[in-house]
Amino acid sequence: MRTRIFALFLAVLLCIIGGKMDSQAKRPLSSYSTRSYDWGLGQNLNHKKPNGTGPAGWKCKKDHAYYIGKCSKKNKVVYLSFDCGYEAGYTKKILKTLKKHHAKAIFFVTKDYIMSNPGLVKKMKKEGHLVGNHTTHHPRMAKLSVKRIQREIKECEKAMKKKTGFKMDPFIRPPEGNFSMRSVKVAKSMGYSTIFWSLAYYDYDTANQPGKNFVIRKFKTYYHNGMIPLIHACSKSNTEALGEVLAFLKKKGFRFGT
């Protein structure tokens, strides 16, 4: 009788352990879809959170992917984000304006940017900003192999430490907003959160700038709680508008979080 009871107990125990092993088994990263998505936004009406693009039913937060920051009715926050693919001579002015308004931000930098502007990147960190990963070669990420995605992230990360002495903050912005389930999963496996945006406009062409007033109107028309604006640091219009934008948002009761 005791033997039968022990055997039954052992069988149940093995089932429990086996179930845990199955649930904890890691799916190979290479098995995730490489279907390409380009991040975009639905129309943002009445200062409400816009809808983003992605796979149907995708719960992006489960994959550590975000386009709206943490906020509440009592805690109104804007999360300023700047993309730095190359330096056009405006970043010092941007940093000065942020400091004047006591505003913190995250700067997403490429390896080339780090290598060419280590002093500026150090300044970002020393002034309390986050510095995130914008990859090594600025590729469209969706179709890349697992190893290539890892290399794009890791080499930029290594350059950050080598050239500035600072560790890269664990946030990545995929170039051009291009992603797949594979690229997001690989970033997550490396300890990164993928950061998209909830406000963007045509600002990255240095030869065809939208103008200071256009930028200000965009923020006044489409601001919302938890907003993550995509701001290219190479833009003259953004640089000229930033002070007025920050003053407007503060007047509306927002603080600037990271």
List PLM regions with ranges.
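Short amphipathic alpha-helical segments
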Residues: K93-L95, V184-K185, L242-G243
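Sec-dependent N-terminal signal peptides of Gram-positive bacterial secreted proteins and lipoproteins
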Residues: R2-D22
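N-terminal pre-catalytic segment of deacetylase/amide-hydrolase enzymes
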Residues: G18-S81, Y86-K96, K100-H102, S116, ...
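Short phosphate-engaging motifs
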Residues: M21, S116, F179, S237-A241
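Metal-dependent polysaccharide deacetylase catalytic core of the NodB/CE4 family, i.e.
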Residues: K76-V78, A88-Y90, K99-N213, R217-I231
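Catalytic grooves of carbohydrate-active enzymes
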Residues: Y223-T258
